[in-house]
UniProtKB/Swiss-Prot annotation:
Primary residence: cytoplasm
Subunit structure: Associates with translationally inactive ribosomes in the nonrotated state.
Protein name in the entry: Coiled-coil domain-containing protein 124
Keyword Cytoplasm appears in the UniProt entry: yes
Name of encoding gene: ccdc124
Compositional bias ranges of the Basic and acidic residues kind: 18-45, 52-74
Subcellular location: Cytoplasm, Cytoskeleton, Microtubule organizing center, Centrosome; Midbody
UniProt key word Coiled coil: yes
UniProt cross-references to PANTHER family, sorted A to Z: COILED-COIL DOMAIN-CONTAINING PROTEIN 124
Role noted for this protein: Ribosome-binding protein involved in ribosome hibernation: associates with translationally inactive ribosomes and stabilizes the nonrotated conformation of the 80S ribosome, thereby promoting ribosome preservation and storage.
Amino acid sequence: MPKKFQGENTKSAVARARKAEAKAVADAKRQKEIEDAYWQDDDKHVMRKGQRKEDKEKKRLEQLERKKESQRLLEEEDSKMKGKPIKPAAPSKVTRAQIEETLHREEEEKAISEKPKTHLEIPLEENLNRRILEEGEVEARTVEDAIAALSMSKELDRHPERRMKAAFTAFEEINMPRIKQENPNMRLSQLKQLLKKEWMKSPENPMNQQHATYNAQ
């Protein structure tokens, strides 16, 4: 009696089919990930390459703009030195660094031009070497000259206050520069007060000479 044919186990077949399908899905997914990673790396490479090209072009344009600006400033400086106006250049793109550099240079030039003068550079508010001679005033450059010129008149000798003004003028011209140098921060009125104090005690003061003569007698 022949053996009865036994068919394939249905459950085993289904399990193998599912396993094969899952493997196929996993393989397809893994392959897709590999391809995506490849194209992603390729995209990054392209982007980096494009960025480098863009940066290079940007630097080239900035260098060109700086060169144009430097040339314009050089021509402008040459024109100022020669005293000839130049034709204004067409406005060009200037970088922020160039603007800051130009402003910094202008501020330095302005600071140098506005540097405060020292007391030696500032002229006296009153020219002590040029005075208008008033009626009856004797012109003298030194105290000795003033006294010699005025002592020729016995009338004036009897009245030293009349030659006081000329003697004080000579005294002021001699001593004011020294007082001003010793006190550079004082105003002219303060300097004159110091000068007057010295004058009141000075032997060159005709009034002091009169007192000295009287005391000697």
